[in-house]
Amino acid sequence: MKLSAALLAIAAFANVASAQDCDTPATVSGYSNSALPDPFTFNDGSPVTTAEDWECRRSQILALIQGYESGAAPPEPESVTGTASGNSLSVQVSYGGKSITFNNSITYPSGTAPAEGWPVIIAYEFPSLPIPSNVATLSFQNSAMGKQDSTSSRGQGLFYDLYGSSSNASAMTAWAWGVSRIIDAIESTPDAKLNPAAVGVTGCSRNGKGALMAGALEPRVALTLPQESGSGGDACWRLSRYEEQQGSQVQTATEIVGENCWFSAGFDQYVNNLDSLPYDHHLLAALVAPRGLISYANTDYVWLSGMSSFGCMTAAHAVYEALGVPENHGFEQVGGHSHCQWPSQLDGSLNAFINKFLLGQDVSTDYFESNNQFNGVTWSESQWINWETPTLN
């Protein structure tokens, strides 16, 4: 049986969490808050004051996101086998007497691979941002892993062939699981010539939502690059609702659950009572901390909920600040280009984050900018953030 690094990390933390009596319920009864929930307060109301506290709080947030919207992570597979052939990595996964195989095409840099392998960015379907020539690209067909045709495709795809169509894992959880299995295969397949310690993940639009979820759920992802993910991605549910109330036609939680199966079926019961959620997507992004994260937003498309993305990532940035690594989290928001079309003016921040987190270079990644074009809706930090940012040592 292959024990993945992720499972080892979870098991190691479980011992620490148990010693600290870290309570991680899937839901919290009686919660009500119209503002963005405090990252630095435990479920029981006590404060998060140390970096060790944050590890427990992070586990709480992870449990809540799985309990309310993404669905539970499945049991670990019994085996994961990778086979490298030419420009392809085949991944075979077995569990409960069943097996699935999925193939991933790879574009390699020219020349001889470093001893540790090439850094690699896993792109959902295909990359819509420019990946440097010294970084490999692995194209992951996430829609085959968990179909996203409509709500009627719930429970369909390779993931559900293995774990059953009744699994409450959302399509995005299935995709994140697929990313984890790719990393397992990279770790165990030296012939793939990819560095498992230098893995990024990216996607745009609906796949951008998935890329952020993968970065949050899989701790071996060194750099997360969601692009124009909007509501359900780097935008917060509460803030998107507010934008709609102010007259903007944006994607909201109530709309999104009727559009597709990106979230678990259980999320439906909360979308008309968002104040009952003891988290929002600033806390989803906070799960990535202290690893590298930069998200890209496009204000030309009101549907993407621009104020919500900016405000949500502003709130998430507080966690990076508390951990002493604000430069590890970036945000860039511009207009003047089509949806999922990359504007060259963003090359600087993208290359900086790739150079730092995948190539190990000592470069500045101090990028957090917006054009503040929010269709007439104003972001007011004091309206949404009513908590202080501590220093977590």
Curated annotation (Swiss-Prot):
pH-activity note: Optimum pH is 7.
Catalytic activity, as annotated: a 4-O-methyl-alpha-D-glucuronosyl ester derivative + H2O = 4-O-methyl-alpha-D-glucuronate derivative + an alcohol + H(+)
Modified residues (Pyrrolidone carboxylic acid): 20
Organism: Schizophyllum commune (strain H4-8 / FGSC 9210)
Subcellular localization: Secreted
Function description: Glucuronoyl esterase which may play a significant role in biomass degradation, as it is considered to disconnect hemicellulose from lignin through the hydrolysis of the ester bond between 4-O-methyl-D-glucuronic acid residues of glucuronoxylans and aromatic alcohols of lignin.
Protein name: 4-O-methyl-glucuronoyl methylesterase
A GO term for molecular function: carboxylic ester hydrolase activity
